[in-house]
Amino acid sequence: MAKPCGVRLSGEARKQVDVFRQNLFQEADDFLCTFLPRKIISLSQLLQEDSLNVADLSSLRAPLDIPIPDPPPKDDEMETDKQEKKEVPKCGYLPGNEKLLALLALVKPEVWTLKEKCILVITWIQHLIPKIEDGNDFGVAIQEKVLERVNAVKTKVEAFQTTISKYFSERGDAVAKASKDTHVMDYRALVHERDEAAYGALRAMVLDLRAFYAELYHIISSNLEKIVNPKGEEKPSMY
């Protein structure tokens, strides 16, 4: 019976892997000790900005440069008195909501950053999982629980990206309907409703981002010993 062979790496390849691991562990250390506390504070400051504390949502409305057609002639007009039916004037360039776009420019990078940090933490913990063998696996179970939670946060953050894309799609549809059926005022109102709903969603995103960072800080720092030293070795090390 053939013996299973181990992974054979050249000396140079092994060096490159070791450098990657060292950089990974250093990034994880910086993330936990420096980045996380600062990010929680910076998001708290962002939530105090005027742009995220708009009380009158009607002030968020962007002007819709969509011509309103003249009302139809009265039914009792004589056919000879009626003018030829005029074609509805076409719309020109319709920009997006500048206030929402400015807010999106602040929030989108924060969403991307948290997603990348989740990937960093996941990769870091995966590299700390010891060789599977009989013995005390309590620490490994904790690693798996933390990984499960970080993956859940990553999934929620990815849903934020979908929400942002959906805003443009739904608002675009509403604007298209308003420009096509210019006599239907409800379509114009729908555009404003989309903007107001998006504003509320963006503020909620920032609140959630801050909460996720706080959760990551708590769950990692509370279980750090078992994460970096799952087998209870004498000399635990993040590196």
Swiss-Prot record:
The protein's name in its UniProt record: Proteasome activator complex subunit 2
The Gene Ontology biological process terms listed for this entry are: antigen processing and presentation of exogenous antigen
Protein family membership: Belongs to the PA28 family.
- Residue numbers bearing the N-acetylalanine modification: A2
Q: How does it assemble?
A: Heterodimer of PSME1 and PSME2, which forms a hexameric ring.
Induction conditions: By interferon gamma.
The entry's cellular-component GO terms read: proteasome activator complex
